[in-house]
A protein has these predicted regions:
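Active-site-adjacent loop/helix segments that line or gate small-molecule/cofactor pockets in enzymes
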Residues: 108-112
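A charged helix-plus-loop insertion that forms the helical arch/lid used to bind
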Residues: 75-86
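ATP-binding/phosphotransfer module of carbohydrate and carboxylate kinases, centering on a glycine-rich
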Residues: 1-61, 71-74, 91-102, 117-124, ...
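Glycine-rich phosphate-binding loop of actin/hexokinase-like ATP-binding domains
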Residues: 122-181
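Short hydrophobic alpha-helix segments
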Residues: 28-31, 81, 150
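Short loop/edge segments at beta-strand edges and connector loops
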Residues: 104-106
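Hydrophobic "anchor" residues
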Residues: 24-25, 77, 146-147
Length: 318
């Protein structure tokens, strides 16, 4: 069986895996980083390739998922604010180093491909993945094909505005973007926004700077009034964004991944009726909303799958 190296470049860590054509992760490495440089990526990939070769695995290609705007035809990172990279020739650098095919794409698109091929989206033709973490990443599959857009920018679902007049300021500079309202960061901001109504709340008593979306969610599950109010507003905004996605794409399935998805049924059961109420132009209940099946492995599995398929872009694309 052919294998590929799948690499997921995160803001504070790199995950590298050897993945087979069946989508099974055979070896996996996690590397915590303070500042990601090209040399670090090269050394991590080299170590992973050596592991595979020590076990007589046939490494056919390398796939990289990176945050930012990626030229999927050349493998260049056009712009990645996470790493302060601009027009960085990541694909070319790795191809010269290892003399095997290397393919680079946006990390959320890679995760979408992984979930579509081997996770929640398997067996569907129209599928959307949303990753709720610090921000909101995403990817769209339409009629069985990953939607890339004219310049590889399709799927930036996190930056459509759901509260343009009364929302939080997004990192992109706009007001009320989906990710500003319904990401893990958005949940924290909701907690601070409703805090004046809960002057005796214990949620912010200790180290407010360390408040996390996980802490808020757990407190909401335990019935804390402050956390419940923040969670209610967060779920309302999540429902708005999901209803918009259904109107835009009309997928069979929306999978929710990322750190916030660990809320599981507590999140899904709360958001589904609101989405149904907001869905007007397509038949209600025709889109299922589920927690993504592959979890943190989706990016690596998708990157490796992309590499084994020969990339995301065909040779005739201009």
């Amino acid at each position: 069986m052919r294998t590929a190296i799948g690499v997921d470049l995160g803001g504070s860590h790199v995950s590298a895996s050897v993945v087979g054509e069946d989508g099974i992760v055979q070896y996996q490495h996690e590397h915590d980083l303070d500042d990601l440089q090209f040399d670090t990526v090269v050394s991590i990939v080299a170590a992973t390739i050596q592991l595979a070769r020590n076990d007589d695995k046939n490494v056919a290609a390398i796939g990289i998922g990176s945050p930012g705007n990626i030229d999927a035809s050349s493998g260049a990172v056009l712009y990645s604010p996470n790493f302060r990279w601009s027009n960085a020739p990541l694909g070319e650098t790795l191809r010269k180093q290892f003399s095997i095919p290397v393919f680079v794409a946006n990390d959320a698109r890679c995760a979408t491909l992984g979930e579509f091929a081997f996770g929640t989206g398997k067996g569907t033709k129209d599928f959307v993945l949303l990753t709720l973490g610090t921000g909101i990443g995403g990817g769209i599959v339409a009629n069985g094909a990953l939607v890339l857009g004219n310049r590889w920018g399709a799927g930036e679902i996190g930056h459509h505005q759901i509260r343009p007049t009364d929302g939080f300021v997004c990192g992109c500079g706009k007001i009320g973007c989906f990710e500003a309202q319904a990401s893990g960061t958005g949940l924290i901001r909701h907690a601070f926004a409703v805090a004046p109504s809960f002057p005796r709340s214990a949620l912010l008593d200790r180290s407010p700077a360390k408040l996390s979306s996980k802490k808020i969610r757990k407190a909401a599950q335990e019935g804390d009034g402050h956390a419940c109010a923040a969670w209610k507003n967060f779920i309302g905004d999540l429902a708005l964004g999901l209803a918009n996605v259904i109107a835009f794409v009309n997928p069979q399935t929306i999978a929710i991944g990322g750190g916030v998805s660990t809320a599981g049924d507590f999140m899904i059961d709360a958001v589904k009726p609101l989405v149904d109420a907001l869905t007007t132009m397509v038949p209600k209940g025709t889109t299922t909303i589920e927690v993504a099946a592959l979890g943190n492995d989706a990016g690596q599995v998708g990157a490796a799958t992309m590499a084994l398929q020969g990339g995301l872009v065909d040779e005739n694309r201009t």
